[in-house]
């Protein structure tokens, strides 16, 4: 259902809509509207309608949206109607914190593997049933990976090398927390998360607002 013409900010907002709809569903609320979604997320109702229009018709004017139906359709658009197996690559403080984040399994992202290079960590247990393995084991894997997504939390000076190992091993997507731009080909999708860039964006907004 996705189109390459859909802007990335739209996809990110869809994930926000999905989370809000799940909250409504858990509260037993059957109907909502673009105005209600917009008010909850501090955006314009016209933006909500525009974002949804990329993927077809979802509601009727004056009637609104069926919460359950819209939630399921957005899940399908985002690919989160099924479980995604995830590996933590780099089991430092950040990697451990992410692995224990309760929202992951709630939204069908299941940690199934963990890799590091620190000999002191190898074979220790990250989560029940998930021992930490050495990254070199990925080089020796001849069979299909047991995960599709890698969360990369390694130092920037080794991030590209580790990403290359993951790509050659057959990973489909990398969520990269290293503060470096990774080079890749069309075999893998890379999403970068950079806290410093987000903080700089925040400081710009603060300066613009108060100076």
Swiss-Prot record:
Which is a GO BP term held by this UniProt record? Answer: response to redox state
Q: Any idea which GO molecular function terms this record carries? A: DNA binding; DNA-binding transcription factor activity
Gene3D superfamilies annotated for this entry?
Answer: NAD(P)-binding Rossmann-like Domain, Winged helix-like DNA-binding domain superfamily/Winged helix DNA-binding domain
The highest taxon in the source lineage is Bacteria
Q: Name one GO cellular component term.
A: cytoplasm
Segments of the chain annotated as binding DNA = 16-55
Subcellular location, record wording: Cytoplasm
Family to which the UniProt record says this protein belongs: Belongs to the transcriptional regulatory Rex family.
For this entry, the protein name equals Redox-sensing transcriptional repressor Rex
Q: What organism is listed for this UniProt entry? A: Petrotoga mobilis (strain DSM 10674 / SJ95)
**Lineage of this protein's species?**
Bacteria, Thermotogati, Thermotogota, Thermotogae, Petrotogales
* Gene behind this protein: rex
